[in-house]
Amino acid sequence: SESIACIGMGVIGCGWASHFSGQGIEVHAWDPDSKSEDLFKRTIEQAWPSMEKLGLANGASPDLVVFHKKIEEAVENCSLVQESSPERLELKQELLSTIDKACATDCVIASSTSGYLVSDLALHCSVAPERVVVGHPFNPVYLLPLVELVAGPQTSVSTMDRAENIYSNSGKTVLRLEKEIDGFIADRLQEAMW
């Protein structure tokens, strides 16, 4: 069965972990901050009643989320790694490079970024940059189904297909962008409507 790594467990990472565990998917979590596990417990306690109303999958449980001490352990057997670290390009590049070296070769590496381009994010991914995408959610992640899936110039079609399948199977509505643009689609629509 699928397992997913959530790297960076702030508000967005905790939202993703809540969403995936509510769909019965095993989640491997990592964050450098030791308090992140408490934040997740608080997030999922608040989220679970709303998620129950929307409908949980068979086998859904907050206990599906396991925290790891090392990022390498969190990502090693996953089909998707969802990176949701703070919006600092150098930090994301460093994390994605580490993930790229540690995860399986057919694993999709997705960043939750709301602003950076795949081509910049994947700059230091030397193993398989063709499997890096942006998977940009809307907050709260466990309630709003839309995810923008964005390819970079090196991203392979098979990576996009796999990412779309994983997100769709977890109950997400995927807006697929084959070319990267500044600001993605939904954010631009929001700006245009103002």
Predicted regions located by residue number:
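Short amphipathic alpha-helical segments
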Residues: 17-18, 41-42, 93-96, 121-123, ...
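Rossmann-like NAD(P)-binding element
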Residues: 32-35, 39, 49-108, 116-117
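Amphipathic alpha-helical segments at domain termini/boundaries
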Residues: 4, 18, 22, 61-83, ...
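Rossmann-fold dinucleotide-binding core
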Residues: 108-179, 183, 187
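NAD(P)+-binding Rossmann beta1-loop-alpha1 motif at the extreme N-terminus of oxidoreductases
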Residues: 1-54
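Internal nucleotide-binding/catalytic subdomain
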Residues: 188-194
